[in-house]
Amino acid sequence: SEPGLALLFLIGALTLGAYQAVFNMVPYRFSAAPYLFPTWIVSGFFLVNAFGSLAASVSGNLVARYGRRRVMPFAALLTLIGLVLTIFETLWIVIPALIVFAIGFFAVHATASGWVTARAVAGVGAAGQAASAYSISYYLGGSSFGTLGGIAWYHWGWSGLVTLTATLISLVVIFALLLRRIPPLQKSGY
């Protein structure tokens, strides 16, 4: 019933959904024409997630300095920019784009999951339940939209996948901006 938590649950679902959809299809994209990379090279594309892991800790520092209300929309927009740039076929654009996408995703998730707990403690006082609800929505979104990403890839290729996932991340950007308009809870400022 708390609107801030509801938006955070949706952000988690949509963000992981887009992330899983993209990285589920990365092997198919890079093993097909024009790349035709062997499996051992395609597997290397998952190393971009190391940058995302670093981004999670950096986003914590950014949240401490600038606040969740500023970091979340920026991270969501970064995710969207990285995603859209993957539409190109040139590797020197696609690889950095996947890195930016991963960085944005991990920053959104780290910010959202921390915000859920802080908002729940300050508001309804049920941090465990809120964290569980976030996890459920996060993984439901990942499995549902990850599957839809495969369908989009099958019918429309990478451009169809990018269209689907860009729609999801655009909603995340909108929801992150809406979170800025929801008044902070008095006890914590979240």
Q: Where are the model-predicted features located?
A:
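Pair of pore-lining "gating" transmembrane helices in MFS-fold secondary transporters
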Residues: E2-A21, I99-I103
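Helix-loop boundary and gating motifs at the non-cytosolic
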Residues: G17-Y35
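Intracellular helix-loop hinge segments at the cytoplasmic ends of transmembrane helices
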Residues: Y28, F106-V121
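Loop-to-transmembrane helix entry
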Residues: A32-F51, A126-A133
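Helix-to-loop junctions at the C-terminal end of transmembrane segments
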Residues: L54-R68, W153
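C-terminal transmembrane helical hairpin of 12-TM major facilitator-type secondary transporters
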Residues: R69-A112
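A late C-terminal transmembrane helix in Major Facilitator Superfamily
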Residues: R119-G160
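Multi-pass alpha-helical transporter architecture, strongest
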Residues: L164-Y190
